């Protein structure tokens, strides 16, 4: 699992690749960065911003809403890319507890477990609870491997709709947790489905256009690399219901690296994993755990902190690596 941030920190480097298919090389280079341990999100006036986790974060006022994004913890993973995913999750929570500003709550954008085992969910809960934060979850495909998705739904899905979608409000911001791993399409593309789209349209239709919106789901709601299933086939319809809002932020995981894109009033951001990195889009035959030198692993894992401030359009997002 990882924490996500929208900003570029001093310890981040650009990841380059030369493939022209899927997304244009220039566009990916413009929006893609490797980050470290986490993302600190600040929403101020509806706008996400990128902050240095120990510097600018300390300057945030009490009028800001700050929350944490975790993603892709893959508890139970023990392959060469990271033989101790539980240990790096623990390191991430230590980072969270050392933040200069305590987040109001956390969101987890899926793949809590690696194999949907009850014991893996138990271990994840034990570690994440050490943050002493309320956590709002959405599932990844690795959380839905057991018959009827019972272990995830019994633990995290109470009070949700359908396969686990829901919404809530905090400090004037409307948060929407969506599920796009229930019925994966060809190549592993995410899918929201007609029932969830109908629910979304109804969920937001009575909101003022000035309401800041934060959507979070596991698979990106923008097409990053369709050959690897890094996108959601019906995301465009979902986003059409959000066009009238002045500030929309979409937070995802799944690809285990930080990428960001801004389209009009919508900011898209993907978070790091706390378990293992994956290749840059098109760099290799397929996605999956990527083995890197041991001294580099923790620079590719991390957390994200997000802050919202009144009268600002975009959220401030801070990515912090487990190791600088």
How would you label these PLM feature ranges?
Residues 16-43:
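N-terminal secretory signal peptides and thylakoid transit peptides that target proteins
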Residues 78-79, 112, 181-192, 222-227:
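Surface-exposed cleft-lining segments at the edges of enzyme active sites
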Residues 117-212, 234-249, 261-272, 276, ...:
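Extended active-site neighborhood of metal-dependent phosphoesterases/phosphodiesterases
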Residues 208-224:
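Short acidic, glycine-rich surface-loop motifs adjacent to enzyme active sites
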Residues 41, 50-122, 202:
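N-terminal active-site segment of His-dependent metallophosphoesterases
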Residues 317-324:
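Short, solvent-exposed aromatic-acidic interface loops
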Residues 70-71, 106-110, 136-141, 216-217, ...:
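Active-site neighborhood of phospho(di)ester-bond hydrolases with catalytic His/Asp-centered motifs
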Residues 1-24, 51:
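N-terminal secretory signal peptides
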